[in-house]
């Protein structure tokens, strides 16, 4: 492409108070494009700064939706690309009784709301919703309640160490009662990725369902090239994931748009980005929707195995249009935003 980027890397270390400080630092040095943020709280912290400086935040993470900014390019999955496909799969293959467990945080609140409305619209039920403080690692009472209720599945929106510990405790509690947890009370998530499987540990790593647009197990030349390059760049890990792929896609889309525009001016870049930039990404073809500035992505369902990888269970036949506000679905969540997935295993 003839484009050479000089990255300016600042690490807030997960400290929310540092995001606005570091973002201001970059923006006042005339940095016009930032690929970054993971949590919704960090994204919301810095968006006003990008709007003030008329710069672009390239946000490379799946998220809960119901947001739009002319200064953000969303390369991760919107809710119709991860929550609704998971609901479709769970209701079709596991049952209609859900139990929600999440962190007391916007990611869990919104995803549980979407799942609740979608499940109840299809004559299902949500038996309970339990929320825990970020970082909580004691789930004994909640797990006892889940086992007593015997839901068709658990929808897990805990994040970080809380999620890892829940998987371990839940598997152990089920095993002690002779319950085959992965088959009888499967746990489903929209944020479980390969590096997190390694963090869970081998005793509880297998049999969990994840809804994502990318898994390392995708068989394609583009993904093989990505994984080879990733391993060369990060030989010590962590393993590639949906967030790594979304970041990779963001940089390539940015580079192509800058090359086409002949400038890094954010407005010119956005014009070229939506005009012609289709990327042969590791997950398949990716491009940006000109109305929402979210990405067309390919939803998939994976089931974790003992090798801390995912076996593909189903996938959409083609990239799905992003619908961050779910405006294209009917009141019963039965229309275009719940893409039909084909079984692959």
Stretches found by the model and what they are:
Residues 281-345:
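Solvent-exposed, acidic/polar segments of extracytosolic/periplasmic ligand-binding ectodomains
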């Amino acid at each position: 492409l003839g484009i050479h980027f000089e990255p300016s890397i600042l690490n807030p270390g997960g400290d929310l108070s540092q995001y606005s400080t570091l973002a201001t630092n970059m923006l006042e040095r005339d940095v016009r494009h930032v690929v970054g943020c993971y949590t919704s709280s960090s994204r919301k912290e810095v968006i006003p700064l990008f709007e003030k400086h008329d710069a672009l935040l390239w946000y490379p993470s799946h998220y809960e939706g119901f947001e739009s900014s002319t200064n953000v390019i969303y390369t991760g999955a919107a809710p119709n690309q991860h929550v609704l496909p998971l609901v479709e799969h769970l209701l079709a293959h596991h049952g209609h009784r859900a139990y929600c467990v999440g962190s007391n945080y916007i990611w869990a609140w919104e995803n549980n709301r979407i799942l609740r409305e979608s499940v109840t619209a299809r004559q299902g039920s949500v038996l309970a919703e339990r929320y825990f403080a970020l970082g909580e690692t004691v789930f004994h009472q909640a797990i006892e309640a889940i086992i007593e209720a015997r839901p068709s599945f658990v929808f897990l929106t805990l994040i970080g160490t809380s999620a890892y510990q829940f998987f371990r405790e839940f598997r152990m509690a089920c095993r002690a009662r002779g319950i085959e947890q992965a088959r009888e009370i499967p746990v489903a998530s929209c944020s479980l990725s390969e590096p997190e499987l390694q963090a869970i540990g081998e005793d509880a790593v297998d049999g969990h369902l994840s809804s994502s647009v990318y898994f390392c197990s995708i068989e394609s030349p583009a993904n093989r090239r990505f994984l080879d390059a990733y391993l060369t760049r990060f030989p010590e890990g962590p393993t590639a994931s949906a967030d790594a792929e979304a970041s990779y896609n963001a940089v390539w889309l940015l580079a192509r748009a800058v090359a086409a525009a002949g400038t890094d001016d954010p407005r010119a870049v956005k014009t070229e980005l939506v005009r012609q930039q289709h990327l042969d990404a590791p997950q398949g073809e990716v491009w940006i929707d000109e109305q929402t500035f979210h990405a067309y992505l390919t939803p998939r369902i994976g089931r974790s195995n003992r090798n801390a990888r995912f076996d593909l269970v189903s996938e959409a036949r083609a990239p799905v249009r992003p619908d961050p506000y779910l405006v294209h679905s009917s009141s019963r969540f039965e229309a275009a935003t719940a893409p039909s997935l084909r079984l692959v295993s």
